[in-house]
A protein has these predicted regions:
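Concave beta-strand-loop units of leucine-rich repeat
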Residues: 1-11, 17-36, 41-65, 70-90, ...
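Extracellular/mature segments of secreted proteins
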Residues: 197-200, 222-223
Length: 223
């Protein structure tokens, strides 16, 4: 079920009045709040459950939401997946530093998300979304790198990265990764043959990647 749903509040600018703590049995949904700038009152929540779709935390279409530090109390292994989508003002994922695992992560259509900072301690995605993916990063136009994922080792399902037009490389993702099923990676500015080889060695399913043939694309990217 869902323990907290903040949805379709056109005027709500802050959740300062919330005072929740400890463990929430269900999921948290923060969706379609066009004026919400500040998430507060959740810092003492350490654990959340999941909804019937297996989603633990969904932050969707909050156009002016400045950050996710309101979730900094979350620790350990989340009971479901995390979906961060359509939040135009977010620049990073600061707030998840104490999270070490989730079933899956979907990070899509966050126009000003420059970095995945906040996911540095995530080591495992041990489930799949309905498409069979454990990690989906799509259409984040400002995203530059995946360096925050250097500790990520185990991905139980697929990896889908596409449409992040400023993504320089996925070196950070490759660094610690030991397993995944299918891998689909496109539109990365520097994606080399050695990157393809690395994914081919660890993936148990199809590897569908777009290599960059331009030498200049990888200059200055440590290739």
């Amino acid at each position: 079920g869902v323990s907290l749903a903040i949805t379709d509040n056109r005027q709500l600018a802050t959740t300062q009045g919330l005072a929740m703590s400890g463990k929430l049995e269900g999921a948290v949904h923060i969706m379609s709040n066009p004026s919400l700038k500040v998430l507060a009152g959740l810092q003492a929540v350490s654990e959340i459950g999941a909804d019937v779709q297996g989603v633990a935390l969904k932050v969707y279409l909050n156009n002016v939401l400045e950050n996710l530090v309101g979730f900094k109390g979350l620790t350990g292994d989340l009971a479901g997946s995390v979906e961060i989508s359509g939040n135009a003002a977010l620049t990073d994922l600061d707030g998840f530093q104490s999270v070490t695992a989730a079933t899956a992560a979907t990070i899509t259509n966050n126009a000003n998300l420059i970095t995945l900072h906040g996911l540095e301690n995530v080591k495992t995605f041990d489930g799949e979304d309905p498409k069979g993916n454990s990690l989906t990063i799509r259409t984040n136009a400002a995203l530059v790198d995946a360096n925050a994922l250097q500790e990520l080792a185990v991905v139980s399902g697929g990896i889908d990265i596409d449409g992040n037009t400023n993504l320089q490389n996925v070196a950070g993702l490759i660094k610690g990764l030991t397993s995944a099923t299918k891998v689909s990676i496109h539109n990365v500015i520097c994606f080399s043959t050695s990157d393809e080889t690395a994914f081919s060695l660890l993936a148990t399913g199809d590897v569908n990647v777009e290599k960059v043939t331009s030498v200049t694309a990888c200059e200055g990217n440590g290739k």
